[in-house]
């Protein structure tokens, strides 16, 4: 039986009952329009915790003006079916006014690690992400929180926030879930036309090319990135936002691979911005 909480207070009431029984709690934060990638996070959380809270909340403060806040896909009825089927028992689905009181003036900034990759072109994005995730961790009193590697920089940023603020929660990163043809599953894939959907495969092909080169011994970032960029630029519908290699622990640009690295990209296919990545040497 799935309990739907629409306010933090309702969720906290359920959580306090769980905690009183000594139960462990897993948290899966989402923006809804759930797919098999989210489902894999929920199932892992269910396997590793006594109870699981999933949040479904399109977080307005992580969108900049002109981004897709208003058009971001929503289908809460379908989300509820997937959440219940995956075994979670609590979903928090608040309105923005329920999570952010009108005179709220506290935000969570993680500096440095947010300056590269998505943070370059979306400078306020991670402030919004960290603020809402911090709130959800507080509401849920989670023992573990689950995030997909598709948003690899987000995963690194949240780990840093939890470390720096001595938060009592384990951050669990989970593998990217892909379509059969390799495209990373994303709620934004629904924006793509049939032609764009085919063109979008250039991201996973670039990932495969980068992995192939590095597994064959290539350690020059420029060589790997140039090969990936050439592949993407050959697709007429693709426009590169960034293709970069950074250290996995500090998200700082590297020239030569001598430790774990994140190779990440953001690419516009038509008007839709898609991301993909791989981690090497972890």
Segments from the language model and where they lie:
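Phosphate/ribose-recognition catalytic cores of enzymes acting on nucleotide-derived substrates
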Residues: 227-282
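Nucleotidyltransferase catalytic core that binds NTPs
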Residues: 2-237, 246-248, 279
